[in-house]
Amino acid sequence: MKKLIALLMAVMMVLGCVAALADAGSEPAWTEYDNMIATIKSTTDMAERVQLMHKAEDMLMDTGAIVPIYYYNDVYMAKESLTGYYSNPYATKFFMYADFGENTTLRLQLSSEPDKLDPALNSSVDGACLAANSFGGLYTYDANGDYAPNFATGYEVSEDGLTYTFAIRDGLKWSDGSPLTAKDFEYSWKRAAAPETAADYSYMFDGIAGYPDDLQAIASEDGKTFTVTLKAPCAYMLDLAAFPTFFPVQQACVEAAATPDNPGAWALEAGYVSSGAYMLESWEHNKSMVYVKNPNYWDAENVKIERLEFMLSDDDTAVFAAYQNGDLDFIDSVPNDQIASLLENPEFHIVDELGTYYVIFNVKSPMFDGLTAEQAANYRKALSLLIDRQYIIDTVGQTGQKIATSFLPAGMADGNGGIFKSAEGWSYPNGADGYYAEEPDVDQAIELLKSAGFEFDASNMLSASTPISFEYLTNTSSGHIAIAECLQQDFAAVGINMTIKNIDWAVFLNERKEGNFGIARNGWIADFNDPINMLEMWTTTSGNNDAQFGR
């Protein structure tokens, strides 16, 4: 422990960070966190890296802005005769090798209207699924969740781990038949990393030398190799090579329609050029999308399904009815009131995922006006302590989810050959693996609210002289609304008034991203199995920083 303390003190001295108690008003100072993440991404000492990631997790959770509810699992239904489809541990579903017997059309539902189809701009799970089936990267995942070559046939890495050279597959073509080469990767990676593109995931390129203005991701003159130079060794480099933000897009197609204000304009209607197993043939907004087999896909001979017909809806009841009526073959959502009756159904599937369902606070919200940073954090932590997570799992989730006591999920690797939650020399406040006990603690919640200036009467009900009232933002899926109602009930038990606002998926994503909320539902499924993925998203400049830290 003494060694750990000395290490952290040394890091703080090197960073020259200011104390992270209060910026101005109720917001937490965030420079220290940003610098900590930068150090984590640049260090070559992997044991030190693990300890620094634990320190960053402590800083993140101490804000109270992230309220973990449960660790995810995935629930879907598929006809028994449908085989060959698969999902990786990060919730991306692959249908290009699906086999449906004599059927060459697959009718399915993943979500409602997608927010963005440009792979560089997408940050939603449903968008990643669409991208994985219509675009491709250097690498992909096979049915076992292992890395598999895709547009690259292999790679070589330098002895110091800083240079990756990918061999590009011969004969690759875009869906319009034009050649796809390493130069398309160079253009696309530099575009996604560029500040003017405003990609939510642009920070993922930060580990590459020259980011963001002179990215060292260079194609050979003949377009047959693609060389990436890193700032520090990266254990998850192949995960990045398989991630949608790193998929190539055709420069001519992009530049024919994109504008400075809308870099993704080229992919707002059907007919754009893609590179994967399928291409978008038609799109009736807010209703349906039809993808057809891409004859120019490099592995087209192994693609059996000719058409993917998507129903665009997050109305669980309507989706389930369509499945029951035989109008859909695969659905990614099920009404909560049907789950108990489906648990023994062979068409009902529950798959573990590496992610967390949580509630997010906007630290810049007016609901924290007049409070110090410490009081605002205590306010948020108090609300977390009021939540009966097991009740939510038992009555809404119903599929064996585990209570989440931290944002980082159980089972996540530490990047150094171990499990992050079990790292030597570190302990969690709850004595187990997180920051909250599994049971609600109303008494402690009230004490924290009192420390933030709120008053309670003798029966532990909030005083009318210091009322608390706020709006909770969610999308229209029945499960999310049901969870919101559970929270509403828990908060009302001590006199807190919470109203619920539910809006369509694409609108919800943008409202949350823009910070137009005080408290909202959220969820994150890891993009790869390393804690940095769920820590770097909260840096000041990250496009996924929904809490608005440092802004």
Where are these regions (language model features)?
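Detector for C-terminal structural segments
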Residues: 23-106, 284, 386-422, 478-488, ...
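Extracellular/periplasmic solute-recognition and catalytic clefts
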Residues: 192, 281-292, 309-367, 390, ...
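Aromatic- and charge-enriched surface segment that lines or borders ligand/interaction sites
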Residues: 48, 153-201, 221, 227, ...
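Append "and occasionally in soluble cytosolic enzymes with long acidic Gly/Pro-rich linkers
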Residues: 29, 55, 292-293, 374-489
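Surface-exposed binding/hinge segments that line
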Residues: 81, 156, 186, 201-255
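N-terminal lobe/hinge region of extracytoplasmic solute-binding protein
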Residues: 68-70, 76-77, 90, 109-159, ...
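A structural "hinge/loop" feature
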Residues: 77-94, 112-128, 151, 237-248, ...
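Gly/Pro-rich hinge or "lid" segments in bacterial periplasmic/extracellular proteins
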Residues: 116, 122-125, 132, 140-146, ...
